[in-house]
Design a protein with these regions (language model features):
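C-terminal binding/interaction regions
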Residues: 135, 141-170, 174
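Conserved active-site and cofactor/substrate-binding residues in soluble primary-metabolism enzymes
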Residues: 1, 21-25, 63, 80, ...
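Divalent metal-dependent catalytic cores for phosphoryl transfer on phosphate-bearing substrates
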Residues: 39-145
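Long, compositionally biased
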Residues: 104-109, 116, 163-164, 171-173, ...
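A generic structural signal for well-ordered alpha-helical segments enriched in polar/charged residues
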Residues: 28-35, 70, 74, 174, ...
Length: 181
């Protein structure tokens, strides 16, 4: 599947600008991590996983990660793409556990990119470029701030990867700096 085909599929099921922007943020974050972790030859695939991870969320929020599997299977998409995107709902909506490092990264950064995005919006600069880990950690501890971003999932993702929370946050900030102002 090409990036263009993935975008067409995504926009068939998603119309809200917020969801489309989130998909692109996760896509680019996944590409950064592919390169960083030594999977450069799979960078585009990691990006597709990020782009399509919430394919079903807008239309089927109660069947998130379940409906997308059906949609992708109907389209004849490869099993590893289906498994990777579904696994980010592990212990939330589905029992498919992230196994590959790519799946663990997706699990960890999906919620975290949302939290970081909310932190950035509160900053005078409105930029990730001058964002520090301590600023994110402060808001991470405030459960009412960006309440829709599960701290438990973010921490579980860091644990799956064998990283500290600080390392996950720092690397995700670096990823976002590469493509955001």
């Amino acid at each position: 599947m090409t990036r263009e085909e993935a975008w067409e599929l995504l926009t068939e099921y998603n119309k809200e600008e917020f969801h489309l922007e989130h998909a692109q943020i996760v896509e680019n974050t996944m590409k950064y991590f592919a390169q960083k972790l030594g999977y450069g030859e799979e960078k585009e695939f990691w990006g597709l996983v990020g782009l399509l991870h919430d394919l079903d969320f807008e239309q089927y929020p109660e069947e998130h990660c379940i409906k997308s599997q059906e949609i992708m299977k109907e389209r004849g998409l490869e099993e590893r793409l289906i498994h990777a995107t579904a696994s980010h709902g592990y212990a939330i909506t589905i029992d498919i556990e992230p196994v590959h490092e790519m799946e663990k990264v997706l699990y960890a950064v999906d919620e975290l990119t949302g939290l970081i995005g909310a932190v950035v919006l509160m900053r005078p600069s409105k930029s990730v470029q001058d964002l520090k880990v301590k600023s994110v950690k402060k808001k991470f501890k405030s459960k009412n701030f960006a309440a829709g971003c599960s701290r438990e999932v973010i921490q579980r993702g860091a644990d799956m990867l064998g990283w500290t929370l600080d390392d996950l946050i720092a690397q995700t900030i670096e990823a976002l700096k590469t493509f955001q102002e």
